[in-house]
A protein has these predicted regions:
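Short alpha-helical "patches" and their helix-cap loops
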Residues: 1-4, 226-228
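FAD cofactor-binding and catalytic pocket of flavoenzymes
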Residues: 64-127, 144-167, 177-190
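Flavin-dependent oxidoreductases
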Residues: 3-114
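A sequence-composition feature that detects small, non-aromatic residues
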Residues: 6, 27, 31, 35, ...
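C-terminal catalytic lobe of FAD-dependent flavoproteins
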Residues: 125-228
Length: 228
């Protein structure tokens, strides 16, 4: 998308013009980018975090924990911490980490690399880490350790009764579209829904489970789209 008209009724994209009566911006990692294209001014800025997972293998299936295990969360941060996860095939994982990343789609190094985005996000992250806003410096240091096998092995001793026979970095990667509140200088831990004329912006929808939630869809429709 190149731009939105000043009256918020027309989208210009790749030399094509699209007229609309209502648009819902729920673009996840790109939601703030689209909001900026519509000239929406907010106190929020995007700080993406990458989540990586470690695949855990045990010598016997009976040694695999039969329930999800979560750490006690840090209430100063909107993250659940590294916890256990299963996939549909029964594989067992530990994760995700929450590492600051300098690109909305930086799932792999230097793929879909955007230099301007890299510079902008690097600048924002570096300043916040230097001044330790919302303990981001401490978070970055602690999460950086989770990129190394030795640290994950140490953590696994707390989670499991039996020692894993193999721990390997999984190809599963996710990027969290986290919003930072410039006024409170904290990572925001709730949805941000803003109605701008006939555009509804849904920011900080950090999880696919949230964006696919019927309850969330019902809330948006009832409060922002249905005329009473």
């Amino acid at each position: 998308m190149d731009s939105i008209s000043s009256d918020n009724t027309t989208i210009i994209s790749k030399n094509k013009i699209h007229n609309f009566d209502l648009i819902i911006n729920s673009a996840g990692l790109h939601a703030d980018y689209l909001a900026n294209k519509s000239n929406l001014k907010t106190r929020y800025t995007s700080l993406p975090f990458k989540g990586k997972y470690w695949k855990i293998s045990f010598g016997d299936k009976n040694e695999i924990p039969n329930r999800l295990i979560y750490p006690v969360p840090n209430l100063d941060q909107p993250f659940l911490g590294v916890h256990t996860v299963y996939d549909k095939d029964g594989n067992f994982y530990l994760g995700p980490s929450s590492t600051p990343v300098f690109g909305r789609e930086a799932y792999r190094p230097f793929r879909k690399f955007n230099f301007l985005e890299f510079c902008a996000l690097s600048y924002k992250f570096i300043l916040k880490i230097i001044f330790n806003e919302n303990n981001l410096r401490n978070l970055a240091i602690s999460e950086f350790k989770n990129l190394f096998l030795s640290s994950v092995m140490k953590s696994s001793n707390v989670y499991f009764k039996h020692k894993p026979v193999k721990i390997e970095l999984s190809s599963k990667v996710g990027i969290r579209s986290q919003m930072f509140d410039k006024n409170s200088k904290k990572l925001f831990n709730d949805f941000v829904v803003i109605k701008q004329n006939n555009i509804i912006h849904i920011l900080n929808a950090i999880s696919p489970a949230w964006t696919s939630s019927f309850a969330m869809a019902e809330f948006i429709c009832e409060k922002y789209t249905i005329k009473k």
